[in-house]
A protein has these predicted regions:
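Active-site loop/lid in soluble adenylation, ligation, and acyl-transfer enzymes
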Residues: 1-60, 64, 68, 72-76, ...
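Short acidic-glycine loop/turn motifs at beta-strand connectors
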Residues: 45, 149-152, 163-164, 177
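Short beta-strand-to-loop capping motifs
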Residues: 53, 93-97, 149, 175
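Residues forming anionic-ligand binding surfaces in small-molecule and nucleic-acid pockets
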Residues: 77-96, 184-194
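Internal, conserved structured core segments that host functional sites
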Residues: 87-144
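Long, positively charged amphipathic alpha-helical accessory segments at protein N-termini or as interdomain linkers
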Residues: 100, 111-131, 161-243
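Aromatic/basic-lined ligand-recognition segments
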Residues: 142-148, 152-160
Length: 243
């Protein structure tokens, strides 16, 4: 549950499909502009590899894959390591006044996911691997920021960004990772797909409902972007100042 000081109304945005630059710019813009909690789900136009905000080094062959048109590269406003966005579902959750302790912040920001997947018949638990490590791949380990399924597969990887007392939590829900591309990028076998019982077409709606139920003290409203918000975002995208 979110802190009682949270503003009275939360904002739900419709699920969107767009290129990586637009998606990351929108999340950064929402973090700067939103005074209340926000949740949105989205998918990516084509395969994208997102780099963590502070990730400065990555394998040279990733650049070659970009040159060959196998994927596109973008930097996230959140931290963490590289995530391959293909065959999955991404979420962005913005929380004002979230707990400053990292583990507690992740716990509060992930419980609705645990509840939602439990209702779908897939129990998840927090990871226990130590933070850090040398792997470039976010899904190479599962820390207390991540959610793991009963088979030991990291099913949700999360990363955070704090700005002016607001928390942005990014999460990638691993559903159907592309085996060939995953091996090209990370030089290891792709994780197993999510169980067939997880309805890919309805997952965003079901998890959205889980958040509303879990944070029932806060009324939520579906509020698509307004025309002036779209215009402001386009200006920031054009200027390159969004992140």
């Amino acid at each position: 549950m979110l802190p009682s000081s949270m503003p009275a109304t939360g904002r739900l945005l419709p699920t969107q499909q767009a290129d990586g630059h637009t998606q990351m710019a929108l999340d950064a813009w929402l973090l700067k502009r939103s005074n209340g909690p926000v949740l949105r789900f989205y998918r990516w136009d084509g395969p994208w590899l997102s780099l963590g905000r502070h990730q400065r080094h990555w394998p040279e062959h990733w650049n070659e894959l970009v040159r060959r048109g196998r994927l596109s590269l973008v930097r996230r406003p959140s931290g963490g390591r590289a995530v391959l966005h293909a065959g999955g579902l991404t979420y962005a959750l913005i929380c004002p006044d979230a707990p400053r302790r990292r583990q507690e912040a992740y716990r509060q920001a992930c419980q609705w996911l645990i509840d939602g997947f439990q209702d779908l018949g897939l129990p998840l638990h927090f990871g226990s691997d130590p933070a850090g490590g040398e792997a470039n791949n976010c899904f190479a380990s599962a820390t207390v920021a991540d959610l793991v399924d009963p088979c030991g597969v990291k099913r949700v990887g999360s990363a955070q960004r704090w700005q002016n007392g607001r928390l942005l939590q990014h999460g990638e829900i691993l559903l159907d990772p592309p085996a060939a591309l995953w091996e090209e990028v990370f030089e290891e076998a792709a994780p197993a797909a999510a169980p067939a019982q997880i309805n890919r077409l309805e997952l965003d709606q079901r998890l959205r409902q889980s958040l509303v139920q879990s944070w029932s003290h806060c009324p939520w409203q579906m509020q698509p972007l307004k025309a002036d918000e779209v215009q402001e975002l386009e200006v920031e995208l054009a200027s390159g100042s969004a992140l």
